[in-house]
Amino acid sequence: MAKKRYRKVTEGIAHIKATFNNTMISVSDPQGNVLCFRSAGGSGFKGSRKGTPYGAQMASEEVGRLARDNFDMRRIAVRVKGPGAGRDSAIRGLRSAGLEVIHLEDRTPLPHNGCRPRKKRRV
């Protein structure tokens, strides 16, 4: 079987969605076409360990290495969405994978007093 040929994309965008249960990182080209994707669950973490900062860091290091090796990516803009624990450690993982972070943006959706929130948990 022939080896898959990847195109050269030197700059990209990392979309990080950090929920309380998991962290998902997808890397796209500047037009928004997804090149590679990884989540903490896809990196081998199961159950409550998916929502940890360590799981987010391992997933982002993996996806950063994929983007660097397969697409020759060097510089990356980061868009973070969500309140999860893996926000900062996912950015740290991209840096440790050898990618230079050129732009950081928080895209967490905030309601302007929209829907009524769910009831508070009583533990």
From Swiss-Prot:
One Pfam family named in its UniProt record: Ribosomal_S11
Disulfide bonds: none
InterPro entries cross-referenced by the UniProt entry: Ribosomal_uS11, Ribosomal_uS11_bac-type, Ribosomal_uS11_CS, Ribosomal_uS11_sf
Keywords, in A-Z order: Ribonucleoprotein, Ribosomal protein, RNA-binding, rRNA-binding
Entry keyword Ribosomal protein: yes
Record's signal peptide: none
PROSITE patterns tied to this protein: RIBOSOMAL_S11 (PS00054)
The UniProt record lists the keyword Ribosomal protein: yes
Family classification: Belongs to the universal ribosomal protein uS11 family.
Function, in words: Located on the platform of the 30S subunit, it bridges several disparate RNA helices of the 16S rRNA. Forms part of the Shine-Dalgarno cleft in the 70S ribosome.
Quaternary structure annotation from Swiss-Prot or TrEMBL: Part of the 30S ribosomal subunit. Interacts with proteins S7 and S18. Binds to IF-3.
The protein's name in its UniProt record: Small ribosomal subunit protein uS11
Species of origin: Coxiella burnetii (strain Dugway 5J108-111)
